Amino acid sequence: HQQFRDLFLQRLVAPTDVGTDRGFDVVTLDDVVGDARHPFPVAHVAERTSWSCHHGVARWGAECPDAADGRWKAPLRAALERLAGAVDAITALTFREAIGEDPADARDAYVDVVLGRTTGAAFAAERWPTADEAVRRRLLDLLEAQRWRLAMFASDGWFWDDPIRPETRQVMRAAARAARLVDGLAGTRLEHTLVADLALLTSPSRG
């Protein structure tokens, strides 16, 4: 993501004359993922890299010159990082005390519930067969909190110029959902802290 690399890519994939061989094929993500005839390698995203402008990750936590006024981004990022830390700590502690496990594998597998491939009850029964119903329900609720904790970091929430946009409001809603779920389970006041932290950011257009 360096300056003018977008022009390079534009020229690279520009339509060619019929019969001209580029030496490579232009494909979409659907072309790759939709081909189930053979497996494809896992892609790893390098830390502190971005898919947008050449200013890099500043777009997602500081003031990027390509956005008119990014002073609201650092307080928002700090608020969500603080909430994420609390949600993770409570989730890890509860899983450890209830079933003696780290929650990471269950969190990743919970996507099957989110996508409707299985029900929460079936998921819990398969993963925690010796746990009683109350424990299973509590662990499922924490995985749901983890779902929203991940959703609140959706990158489009920081991409634009103003936090009043729907993308940023959506990440705040996700954060509130995660906080409320954990507060209901653990008796914490994460939503109260989140609201106080979010009060530090202002909208360039509305103050």
Question: Where are the language model's segments positioned?
Answer:
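Active-site and substrate-binding clefts of carbohydrate-active enzymes
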Residues: 1-207
